[in-house]
């Protein structure tokens, strides 16, 4: 069924020529139907179908099939039975009253029940199926013959009183029109039935029941049994019967409308009386239980009440309240949904070292870069050590030359021996220079070895770390530092014999000479040996200390960061606490305002009540 109403229902069974129905509404609310096409045989069979007479024969194509017999119309008694049944099950079958949770199965069950009740009723002359009854329901609601309800009912009942305004004379005129039209259309073996009470509601305020979609009323046409006969005489007889039934039905409807108007007026009077009695009872109750507004206060409420107190306008009120700390503040205090996290507060146990390293050096270093840095640092440490050694050796040579010159001045007599001493000293100097060159060569070789070792270590560590992240972690530290610090101590065994050799030579060679130079030389050489030993010890200590220092530095950093983390956690908790306290203040304020508002409402109502009492007493 389409939402256009019942008008096209008859044409649905396959007739090819569609009838155009023009409805003209006269002043008195009557309807005259003119056919748009003169040869609309069989189309309009169901068009005017007023009281929903359930003609399930449908219209067939004109010459191919004979006409099916019309089922007899509903009598007035049957209509009353159906109206009462509809009224009983109205909440389910009526679209206006149907709730969303009602599914179509419950609707279908109620329709089945209506059909059963109707067919089992004693006043029913012929059995009807669900399709016919549903069609009657639709048509009767379209023509506003149902629902006959008093003013109490909701929905489309507002315009029902107007139905009775159609006068009996208008009905008689319409019946005459019907008879004429039916006599004309008997030539086409068809009948157009026009209803007296079909009235389009002129008010836009009441929404037309005609405009309701019929899809919501589930129709199942499975059990419509079509009988094939073509007795034309039987059809003409049925049409005459229908005319008589129509006249009887129109009279019955007019009577029913008058009765119903009287009933609705009586019911409205009764309702007014009841509502007045209820109002009086309420007023007396209020007088006995007088509310003392001043005794109400927001302070008496407990914390739980406040927490459970969440009115609908909670947020709007909060926006109007100023922040408690700022007397002049106008900004709105928003509470972020997620607590803001500090960057260091995200450290977990697993990624802790990583986070510390990136905190100390914000740029992340790959392993190769780190090893290159370490290598440069080691070379930088070696260079000043070499420079010191060279400077000390030069100083020693100058001191020896000075001492030799002094000895030569004292021992001019022993010129030959002095010359021999000078020659020996030159030889010693040459030997020392050779030794120095050898030392430098050895140091260069050591540096090359160090570089090779460091490269090998780097390759090994890279092989280990290829599976992991390229960023630097603590696990690489001890291996790299060991690789750099171990070779630093290598010059120790080499330098000891080198420095000891000239001392032995000088002791041997100068022993025959004067006592003064030999003592001075021995002291100088002892000082040199002590200085070199101190340097070596310092280098060893530096190598060991640098590793320990680094570890200690990282430990200190870690402790500092842990401390920072705890401080941040406590700060976050403090912030949360402050927020919660602020929220509580807001809740209290909101609640106080709400209570004040309710007090005002109660006062207003009390004043209105007093005025009403005065009015009623006067």
Curated annotation (Swiss-Prot):
Residues 187-196 have a biased composition (Basic and acidic residues). Residues 66-146 bind DNA. The keyword Transcription regulation applies. Residues 213-232 have a biased composition (Acidic residues). One of its GO terms (cellular component) is nucleus. It holds the Pfam family Myb_DNA-bind_5. Keywords: DNA-binding, Nucleus, Transcription, Transcription regulation. GO terms for molecular function: DNA binding. Residues 153-162 have a biased composition (Gly residues). Residues 39-64, 171-186, 233-246 have a biased composition (Low complexity). Residues 31-70, 148-246 are annotated as: Disordered. It is found in: Nucleus. PANTHER family: CYSTEINE AND GLYCINE-RICH PROTEIN 2 BINDING PROTEIN, IPT_TIG DOMAIN-CONTAINING PROTEIN. Self-associates forming complexes of several hundred monomers. Involved in transvection phenomena (= synapsis-dependent gene expression), where the synaptic pairing of chromosomes carrying genes with which zeste interacts influences the expression of these genes. Zeste binds to DNA and stimulates transcription from a nearby promoter. This is Regulatory protein zeste. The gene is z.
């Amino acid at each position: 069924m389409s939402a256009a109403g019942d008008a096209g229902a008859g044409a649905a069974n396959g007739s090819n020529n569609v009838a155009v129905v023009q409805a003209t509404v006269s002043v008195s609310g009557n309807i005259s139907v003119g056919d748009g096409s003169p040869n609309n045989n069989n189309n309009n069979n169901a068009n005017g179908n007023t009281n929903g007479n359930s003609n399930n024969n449908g219209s067939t194509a004109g010459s191919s099939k004979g006409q099916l017999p019309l089922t007899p119309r509903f009598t007035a008694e049957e209509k009353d039975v159906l109206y009462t049944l509809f009224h009983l099950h109205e909440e389910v079958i009526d679209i206006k009253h149907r709730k969303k949770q009602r599914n179509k199965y419950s609707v279908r069950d109620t329709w089945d029940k209506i059909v059963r009740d109707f067919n089992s009723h004693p006043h029913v002359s012929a059995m009807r199926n669900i399709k016919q009854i549903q069609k009657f329901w639709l048509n009767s609601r379209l023509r506003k013959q149902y629902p006959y309800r008093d003013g109490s009912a909701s929905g489309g009942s507002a315009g029902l009183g107007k139905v009775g305004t159609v006068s009996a004379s208008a009905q008689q005129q319409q019946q005459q029109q019907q008879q004429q039209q039916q006599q004309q259309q008997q030539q086409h073996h068809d009948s157009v039935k026009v209803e007296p009470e079909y009235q389009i509601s002129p008010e836009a305020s009441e929404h037309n029941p005609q405009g309701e979609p019929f899809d919501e009323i589930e129709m199942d046409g499975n059990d419509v049994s079509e009988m094939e006969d073509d007795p034309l005489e039987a059809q003409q007889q049925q049409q005459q019967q229908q005319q008589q039934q129509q006249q009887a039905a129109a009279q019955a409807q007019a009577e029913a409308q008058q009765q119903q108007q009287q009933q609705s007026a009586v019911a409205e009077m009764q309702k007014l009386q009841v509502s007045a009695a209820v109002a009086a009872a309420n007023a007396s109750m209020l007088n006995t239980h007088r509310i003392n507004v001043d005794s109400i206060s927001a302070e008496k409420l407990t914390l739980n009440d406040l927490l459970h107190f969440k009115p609908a306008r909670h947020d709007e009120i909060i926006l109007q309240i100023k922040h408690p700390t700022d007397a002049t503040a106008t900004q709105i205090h928003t509470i972020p949904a997620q607590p803001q996290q500090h960057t260091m507060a995200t450290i977990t146990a697993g990624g802790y070292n990583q986070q510390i390293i990136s905190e100390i050096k914000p740029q992340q270093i790959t392993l190769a870069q780190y090893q290159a840095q370490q290598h440069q640092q080691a070379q930088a440490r070696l260079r000043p050590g070499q420079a010191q050694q060279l400077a000390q050796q030069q100083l020693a040579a100058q001191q020896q030359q000075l001492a030799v010159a002094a000895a030569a001045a004292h021992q001019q007599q022993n010129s030959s021996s002095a010359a021999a001493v000078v020659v020996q000293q030159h030889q010693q100097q040459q030997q020392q220079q050779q030794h120095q060159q050898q030392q430098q060569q050895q140091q260069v070789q050591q540096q090359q070895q160090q570089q090779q070792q460091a490269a090998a270590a780097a390759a090994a560590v890279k092989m280990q770390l290829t599976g992991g992240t390229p960023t630097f972690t603590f696990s690489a530290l001890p291996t790299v530092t060991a690789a750099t610090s171990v070779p630093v101590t290598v010059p120790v065994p080499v330098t000891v014999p080198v420095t000891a050799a000239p001392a032995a030579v000088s002791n041997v060679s100068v022993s025959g000479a004067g006592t003064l130079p030999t003592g001075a030389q021995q002291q100088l050489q002892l000082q040199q040996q002590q200085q070199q030993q101190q340097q070596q010890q310092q280098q060893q200590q530096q190598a060991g200390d640098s590793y320990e220092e680094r570890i200690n530095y990282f430990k200190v950093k870690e402790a500092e960061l842990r401390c920072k983390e705890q401080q941040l956690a406590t700060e976050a908790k403090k912030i949360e606490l402050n927020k919660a306290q602020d929220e509580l203040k807001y809740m209290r304020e909101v609640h106080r305002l709400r209570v004040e508002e309710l007090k005002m409402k109660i006062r207003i109502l009390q004043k209105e009540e007093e005025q009403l009492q005065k009015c009623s007493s006067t």
